[in-house]
Amino acid sequence: MTGKRVSYTLDSTLESVNTAEQTAHRMADKAGFAEDERHRISMAVREAAVNAVLHGNAYDPQKKMRVSFENTGDALVITIADEGHGLCERDVPDPLSPDNLLKQSGRGIFLIRSFMDEVRFRALQPGTEITLIKHVRGPSADPTEAHK
């Protein structure tokens, strides 16, 4: 299925995070991703949505999170935007630094980058937008498939 776009404007709640995560899983399934990739995409969306609700909007009921999913045929493109004060990507601490290894938070962007092919940040007025891209790969692109 290509050309399919789904967009939501959601409240700054954990229920909204769940909605975004579930939609990501469904869209990844329809785009033809294998179960392990669907799980990674869903986790990346969950992390980005939690960041938008918790860090961006600070659970402010007046602020919204906008989420869009688009299957381009070549990729699943997911955009999540908040209405917070903005994020400077350079200010995000390295989760692999010895000072940060035992902290209970701070790994979300690291995980998002690990699970997605491309991650882009854009400053909004107000807020931050993150775009997550996962490319669709044919069977020949999977090195484990070539040896079966």
Question: What residue spans do the PLM features occupy?
Answer:
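Conserved short strand/loop->alpha-helix "switch" segment adjacent to the catalytic nucleotide/phosphoryl-transfer site
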Residues: 22-46, 101-104
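Conserved strand-loop elements at the edges of beta-sheets that form or border functional pockets
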Residues: 12, 43, 123
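Alpha-helical macromolecular-interaction surfaces
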Residues: 19, 40-43, 75, 114
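STAS-typified acidic loop motif
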Residues: 7-19
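Conserved beta-strand-loop-beta-strand hairpin that lines the nucleotide-binding pocket
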Residues: 1-7, 52-148
